[in-house]
Swiss-Prot record:
<feature type="transmembrane region" description="Helical">
    <location>
        <begin position="153"/>
        <end position="173"/>
    </location>
</feature>
<feature type="transmembrane region" description="Helical">
    <location>
        <begin position="5"/>
        <end position="25"/>
    </location>
</feature>
<comment type="pathway">
    <text>Lipid metabolism; phospholipid metabolism.</text>
</comment>
<feature type="transmembrane region" description="Helical">
    <location>
        <begin position="78"/>
        <end position="98"/>
    </location>
</feature>
<feature type="transmembrane region" description="Helical">
    <location>
        <begin position="112"/>
        <end position="132"/>
    </location>
</feature>
<dbReference type="GO" id="GO:0005886">
    <property type="term" value="C:plasma membrane"/>
</dbReference>
<dbReference type="GO" id="GO:0043772">
    <property type="term" value="F:acyl-phosphate glycerol-3-phosphate acyltransferase activity"/>
</dbReference>
<keyword id="KW-0444">Lipid biosynthesis</keyword>
<dbReference type="InterPro" id="IPR003811">
    <property type="entry name" value="G3P_acylTferase_PlsY"/>
</dbReference>
<dbReference type="Pfam" id="PF02660">
    <property type="entry name" value="G3P_acyltransf"/>
</dbReference>
<keyword id="KW-0472">Membrane</keyword>
<keyword id="KW-0808">Transferase</keyword>
<keyword id="KW-1208">Phospholipid metabolism</keyword>
<keyword id="KW-1133">Transmembrane helix</keyword>
<comment type="similarity">
    <text>Belongs to the PlsY family.</text>
</comment>
<keyword id="KW-0443">Lipid metabolism</keyword>
<dbReference type="GO" id="GO:0008654">
    <property type="term" value="P:phospholipid biosynthetic process"/>
</dbReference>
Length: 192
């Protein structure tokens, strides 16, 4: 029974729309900014770096804490821990409170990676930074970092591979419009 409570809690934690909450407190309607997405990247488009950093931290933290709680209460049963990670991302992407219209899951995925392993986290962050600095597209950086984390897990952390493959597929699914925009040269670019 305890394991099922942890799984439900993972979805609920993931579904807390921190970016939307913190921007509303500042009088900003995130749905009317940039892409209209409720993730940390769109908070950055408001021009408020502090809010963007806070959104990134909080969205990552909920992924981390969901996995951490599962690790503590699921007797190191990998199945429940991995499902809790997926549910945290699903909660972020499809929050019940917002008619299942949420963010793209990248920051939450980062938090999950931190909970699992620092090596794969560093790979994710380094790839994200390199691609972002080279091309100035957050979406391309996110997709590249996610793909690299999935590939890394296949070669070096096989126990995480299926979980990260599922999360990666979800991240790509939520970025479908960005992928089309990238291919058409219409994607939003961050300038210095």
């Amino acid at each position: 029974m305890e394991k099922y409570v942890v799984l439900i809690l993972s979805y609920i934690l993931g579904s807390i729309p921190f970016s939307l909450i913190i921007t509303r407190i500042k009088g900003i309607n995130l749905r009317e900014v940039g892409s209209g997405n409720i993730g940390a990247t769109n908070v950055a488009r408001t021009g408020n770096k502090f809010l963007a950093a806070l959104a990134l931290f909080l969205d990552s933290f909920k992924g981390f804490i969901a996995v951490y709680i599962a690790q503590q209460f699921c007797d190191n049963n990998d199945f429940y821990i991995y499902v809790s990670a997926i549910l945290a991302v699903l909660g972020h992407m499809f929050p019940i409170w917002l008619k299942f219209s949420g963010g793209k899951g990248v920051a939450t995925t980062l938090g999950i990676l931190i909970a699992f392993n620092i090596d794969i986290t560093l790979v994710f962050v380094i790839i994200w930074i390199i691609v972002f600095l080279a091309f100035r597209y957050s979406s391309l950086a996110s997709l590249s970092a996610t793909s690299t984390a999935v590939a890394w897990s296949f070669f070096f952390q096989r126990n995480l591979f299926l979980t990260l493959l599922i999360i990666g597929a979800l991240v790509f699914l939520k970025h479908h419009r960005n992928i089309v925009n990238l291919l058409q040269g219409k994607e939003y670019k961050f300038y210095r």
